[in-house]
Amino acid sequence: MKILVLNGPNLNLLGIREPEIYGKVSLEEIEKDLTGFAENQGVEIIFYQKNGEGELIDLIHRYYREIDGILINPGAYTHYSIALRDALLAVGKPAVEVHLSNLYKREEFRQHSVTAGACIGYIAGFGVDSYRLGLIALIDYLKRRDNDGASGKA
């Protein structure tokens, strides 16, 4: 099983950017933890962070034939990127959207996700654990789908 993990704009600044909201753990630490956890599950992850919307879309286009699913933290693109939403839908791979903070406890303009509707699930508000929880949910979904022939969105 292979999962593409995508991180949107400014997530490369985790650990220094607004630590009272996002915590003090760096994206590199999240990648290391997630990679180790995935390996223990027999899962390979491909991990990227890009600040450009088109770069994230290009990665989806590049890898969709090789992967089983997508774990994505779109960052600010969550709130307005129809193009990213369309890319997720176009490739037909199950995706889970994750966020460190609970968007519904943030500013009003952050309380809507246009990308979540292209995903089978959404996990937010658990800090760095959101990534691991999202990965667990995606792996379990893929295993059930493969074993039971389940399809479609939850």
Swiss-Prot record:
Gene: aroQ
Pathway as given in its UniProt record: Metabolic intermediate biosynthesis; chorismate biosynthesis; chorismate from D-erythrose 4-phosphate and phosphoenolpyruvate: step 3/7
Protein name, as recorded: 3-dehydroquinate dehydratase
Sites annotated Transition state stabilizer: R17
Keywords: Amino-acid biosynthesis, Aromatic amino acid biosynthesis, Lyase
EC number(s) on file: 4.2.1.10
Pfam families associated with the record: DHquinase_II
Reactions that this protein is recorded to catalyse: 3-dehydroquinate = 3-dehydroshikimate + H2O
Assembly, per entry: Homododecamer.
UniProt-listed HAMAP family: AroQ
